[in-house]
Amino acid sequence: MDAMPIRFDQCLSAWETQINQNIDLIELMIPKLSKLAQGGTAIGTGINAHPKFSEEFCKEMSNLTGHQFKPSDNFFSQLGSQDTIVALSGHLKTTAVSMMKIANDLRWMNSGPLAGLGEIELEALQPGSSIMPGKVNPVIPEATAMVCAQVIGNDAAITIGGQSGNFELNVMLPMICENILSSLELLANTALILSDKAIKSFVVNEDQILKACLLYTSPSPR
């Protein structure tokens, strides 16, 4: 929209802030994710398990992975519900929403050159259309948008799985696990590709920007 002028570094700072905020929220989940329910056995009482099983299991996991794990504060809660994973998924969904917004901004900026904004040129990663010579499709932002839609869908499934616990048991753990791991992998890989193949390599069309009517808004008399 032809409104007020804004610099490209200001646009990029907004994207940076969105992503950094999401990273901070995800990192806050790490201490909660480090508490494991192993040793609670079927319903959290620890029946038929050695009294030190949970503690020893966490020590072994810490040694194997290099991350510090601890026994759950409450096995009954952690076996019957998956609130921590639901919360993590919510933060991943928010990250996906932010990334989709960035991808859509790139698509709009790249639109044109005649019937669109034409403010930037994305790197041509593959041939465009055989019937429209010179057309460059924003394939990375488009792929990013699809991934983000999938992560948002995964979050919906995880939410349903989390609320499906009955008393001290939740039989939807395999589905929850599949979707949270999928969301983590999809977002991690896509964030790198979006950064390397779209954001780092786009070229600003200065001539096109200088023709924008919005540049005349700032010096206009009040």
Spans of features found by a protein language model:
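Internal glycine-rich alpha/beta core junctions
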Residues: 4-158
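Short coil/turn linker and secondary-structure boundary residues
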Residues: 49-52, 204, 219
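Conserved small/polar residues in nucleotide/adenosyl-binding loops
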Residues: 216-222
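Glycine-rich cofactor-pocket loops
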Residues: 1-9, 38, 116, 120-123, ...
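Long, amphipathic alpha-helical stalk/connector segments used for oligomerization, subunit docking
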Residues: 150-212
